[in-house]
Amino acid sequence: MNNLLDDIKNNYLFYGFYQRYRAKGRLRSIKRNKKKIPPYLLKDNFEQELNYKLWSTKGARFEASTRNLIQKKLSAQSVGFLSAYLIVINIVHIYNLSFWKLNITANDVAFASTAFSILILLYSQLESAEDHGVKAEKFHSCALEIGELYNKLRLSKSQETDEEKRKRIREISNEYDLVLRKYDNHKSYDREKFILNKYHYHGLNFFERFFGQAKYYFLVKFKYHLLIWAPLILFVGLNILKIYEVIK
């Protein structure tokens, strides 16, 4: 009987400790989530909300324009590198040269040349369809238009009465909706890049910034760098393996 009472007592103490631990965990979670709430939502103020929307959307559209310019540049570079690799392969075939330690047959060279030709053709078509140059220009124009609305809203804070300000806010909000309908939306990682650039305002720590930048790199730049450097890395890697086999 005493053992049963002791077990009940211990279980009760353990359960009480567990409940207190969960309560503290919920409290910490609430505090963390409260810190992540955007400042403009902490107060029920439509003017502040519109101000943040204009500011953040303008920044995201500028980031989208910059991203498309970067992709346009990297796309041209990757096509150039792939074309250079194709020329080198054909030169090796014509002059009967060797690939360092690799013994490449004529059939291997012909296959590699054909594969690179198909890859360049397909990749060029896909990148041409993206039309990064035109998108960059449109996103830039959109950001400028939203920037004008943002400046109007900022000026209305100090130069108008409350009634005039409310009327101006409604007008700016309607104009903002019209601007959004005119242009394509930016990608989610464009807004994330804007938030990363304004990390002090959004309260991001080092790890959030690091993983955010890494995610942006893999989504925007990685595929181009892979096309540029993968053939060269593959060539060097195969030669290193060949040298290792010779030494062994």
Where would I find each of the regions flagged by the language model?
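Conserved non-transmembrane functional hotspots
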Residues: N2-V79, S128, H132-Y224
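Alpha-helical transmembrane segments and their immediate juxtamembrane boundary regions
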Residues: L69-V134, F211-K248
